[in-house]
Amino acid sequence: MSIYNHGMSNGLGRAQSEAAVLTFTDTYVETVRSYVGNEDALTFEVTAETSSGLLRDFLEAVEAKESAGKQLHKFTDVVDGERAFVKSKKTKLEAVDGDLAARVAAAFGRDGYGASLPKVGWRSREWDDAFYEVLDVARRVGSGVGSFGVGRYYVLLRGSPREVDDDDLEEGGAVILDVKYEPAPAVAAVVGEHPGDEAWYASLFPNEAARAVAGQRALTSYADPYAGVAVFDGGAYVVRERSPWKASFDLDEFDTYAEYARYVQAIAATTATSHVRGTVAKAPATFKDVVAAAFRESYARETWGVSVAKVAAAYREQVILDYDCFAAYAANESAWPA
């Protein structure tokens, strides 16, 4: 739906927006099929070196512009000899009361958050009370749609200079963690329709945050070593390191369909690779084997692509209708409940 909507919003028109969706579905299937009989998905990466066009330019700009030191300069400052968050409209951080800060910090001990961290893996490290000492806690506000209505915090760890590049040693190597409450997924509404489903689901994931972290680790090749779970105030929170290279690509930069299509191909290949990496079932066949078999014939791929494009177009129209309805209701204060 997003691919179709961005195409329409950028003036491509219905035909080219539908073509972009078909480009996605075709590339997705071909990418999955290319992984049958090999493990190439494990080494796939999207970098400036492996990309082209505007996406490559964007990745190069982010890499050159951002750094761990610059991130700490933006979000933190040294107060009375200790680093702390800057709470302002610019950082979108707000102060929390002392009791809440203490409860959050308590959740980040060895037997809490520490127990959920990987023991072996990329950049994984043994627990160190000094390194994982919580220096400050702030509430994150005004973030994306996925964060509305859920608790979200930034937690500042003391860290060490060894964790950053030489150019950033003066920053002290502090680590910023993004901590967000994880609500139940849509599938939770149907879990339990069959006897034993709820118990099976609970045996896989002790809480929803553990489910989200397991998914993140399965989908990425260089899994975030700080990805884990923190439980406080009766809720389970997903913990991730805030990447210094966090940025959003501006889709309005595309001037032609060809540029947009190349971007869609890159997104489709990335999505397909993540799905292949994250497959759970190994027998009787893996995800890539099932997809390859289901879409072996060209007519099957074409039928699926056209169906996805139709759903995307209908979904967009429904969202527009829903928004217009909500906007009209919001503008008519007399219709609001007393």
Task: Give residue spans per PLM region.
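Conserved ATP-binding subdomain of kinase catalytic cores across diverse folds
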Residues: 1-54, 58-61, 122-331, 338
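Acidic catalytic cores of enzymes that act on phosphate-bearing nucleotides/polynucleotides
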Residues: 55-147, 156
